[in-house]
C-alpha cells in the first residue's frame, strides 16, 4: 500500500520528475523519437504512474515527467500539443476528438471512482444506491438519517448529521465517472446536471484534485466525496458499498472492478468504453468502475519513445497494478491497445 505522503507528492507542479507537463511547458521532441517524455492528466492514475516512472527509468534510462493536473487538463494539454501524451479517465467527446484528430485513445489502466464518507459513529461499508447518491448531490437528501439512507441500512444507527457533498473543482475524470453513472441511474440528474469532467454541482464544497477532495473529507464530519480507488485505500477512508444492477451491495476491489470490465465483449474502433452501471447479468460488478486512457498523437516526432513507454505500461508495468487497486485489463482491451499503439508513427 502506498503512503499518503507519496500520493500527495504527485500533484504539485514540478514534483514529478521535472514537472514541465503540469506547468504547460512545450514539448518539442526529437527527430530520432528517443529521449524524455512529458505527460499530464488524470490524478486517479497518478499513484500507478509514479511507479511506472521509477521502474521505466531504471529499465531504460529514459525519464517520463507527469503532471497530475486532472483529466480535463490532460485533454487540454494534449490538444494544445504542450505535452507528449495525456491521460484521462474520460474518453474524448466528439468535439474534443474533432479538435485533436490525430490523437488516439488507449485504455491502459482499469480502476474505479469510489464514494467515500466521514461520519462519526458510522463504520465502513454503508449501503447506498445510485438514485440516493444522486439525490445527495442534488441537495435533496441533506442528513445522514434520511429515510432513503435508513431504508438501505436497516438497523444502522444513523446520526442526524448534516451531509456535506464534496466534489472536484477542477476538470476531473473522477467527476466524469460519477456523472456518467448518475446519469444512467437518475433521470433527474441526467436532465439537470448531465455528464462531464466539469459540471455545475447543485450543492456542496469543491476540492482541487483527489488530494484536495481528500483534505476536505478528512476534516469535515458528515462529508461524502468521490476519489480514485488508490486514494480511498491509502487514506483509509470509509467506503460505500454501492448497489449494482443485480441488487448486490459491493465495494471496489480487484474482483468487482474486473467483473465490470468483463462485460466488454467488443472494443469500439475509437477504444472509448463506459463500464459504469454494468448490466444485472454482471452480478459481482462494481458500478463505478472505469478505464483510464492514454491520449497519444499518432504523428508525434517522439513515436519511438511513446511506443516504448506504452508497451511497457501494458506489459511489465502491470506488475504494480494490484497493490494500488488497479485491476487487470481484459484480453480484448489489451489486443485493441496493441493494435492502436502500432498506429503511432505509422
At which residue positions do the language-model features occur?
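Bacterial N-terminal signal peptides that target proteins for export
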Residues: 1-11
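C-terminal motif of bacterial Sec signal peptides marking the signal peptidase cleavage site
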Residues: 18-22
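Bacterial signal peptide processing site
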Residues: 24-26
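N-terminal segment of the mature folded domain
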Residues: 29-150, 158, 210, 214-218, ...
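Short beta-strand->loop
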Residues: 38-42, 136, 144-145, 160-171, ...
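Extracellular/periplasmic juxtamembrane helices and adjacent flexible linkers that interface
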Residues: 156-161, 279-346
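Ligand-binding pocket segment of bilobal, Venus flytrap-like solute-binding proteins
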Residues: 171-263
Amino acid at each position: 500500500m502506498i503512503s499518503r505522503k507519496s500520493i500527495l507528492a504527485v500533484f504539485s507542479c514540478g514534483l514529478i520528475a521535472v514537472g514541465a507537463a503540469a506547468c504547460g511547458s512545450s514539448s518539442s521532441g526529437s527527430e530520432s523519437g528517443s529521449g524524455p517524455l512529458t505527460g499530464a492528466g488524470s490524478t486517479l492514475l497518478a499513484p500507478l504512474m509514479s511507479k511506472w516512472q521509477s521502474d521505466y527509468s531504471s529499465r531504460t534510462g529514459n525519464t517520463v515527467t507527469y503532471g497530475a493536473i486532472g483529466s480535463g487538463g490532460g485533454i487540454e494539454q494534449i490538444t494544445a500539443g504542450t505535452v507528449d501524451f495525456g491521460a484521462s479517465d474520460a474518453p474524448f467527446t466528439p468535439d474534443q476528438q474533432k479538435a485533436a484528430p490525430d490523437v488516439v485513445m488507449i485504455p491502459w489502466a482499469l480502476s474505479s471512482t469510489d464514494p467515500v464518507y466521514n461520519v462519526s459513529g458510522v463504520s465502513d461499508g454503508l449501503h447506498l444506491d445510485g438514485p440516493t447518491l444522486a439525490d445527495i448531490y442534488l441537495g435533496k437528501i441533506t442528513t445522514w438519517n434520511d429515510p432513503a439512507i435508513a431504508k438501505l441500512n436497516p438497523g444502522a444507527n444513523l446520526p442526524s448529521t448534516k451531509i456535506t457533498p464534496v466534489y472536484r473543482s477542477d476538470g476531473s475524470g473522477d467527476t466524469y465517472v460519477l456523472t456518467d453513472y448518475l446519469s444512467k441511474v437518475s433521470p433527474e440528474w441526467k436532465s439537470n446536471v448531465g455528464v462531464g469532467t466539469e459540471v455545475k454541482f447543485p450543492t456542496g464544497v469543491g476540492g482541487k484534485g483527489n488530494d484536495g477532495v481528500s483534505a476536505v473529507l478528512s476534516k469535515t464530519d458528515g462529508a461524502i466525496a468521490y476519489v480514485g480507488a488508490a486514494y480511498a485505500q491509502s487514506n483509509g477512508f470509509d467506503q460505500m458499498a454501492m448497489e449494482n444492477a443485480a441488487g448486490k451491495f459491493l465495494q471496489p476491489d480487484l474482483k468487482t472492478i474486473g467483473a465490470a470490465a468483463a462485460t466488454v465483449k467488443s472494443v469500439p474502433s475509437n477504444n472509448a468504453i463506459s463500464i459504469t452501471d454494468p448490466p444485472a447479468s454482471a452480478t459481482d460488478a462494481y458500478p463505478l468502475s472505469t478505464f483510464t486512457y492514454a491520449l497519444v498523437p499518432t504523428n508525434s516526432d517522439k513515436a519511438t519513445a511513446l511506443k516504448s513507454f506504452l508497451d511497457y505500461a501494458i506489459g511489465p508495468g502491470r506488475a504494480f497494478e494490484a497493490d494500488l487497486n488497479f485491476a487487470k485489463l481484459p484480453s480484448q482491451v489489451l489486443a485493441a491497445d496493441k493494435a492502436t499503439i502500432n498506429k503511432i508513427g505509422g
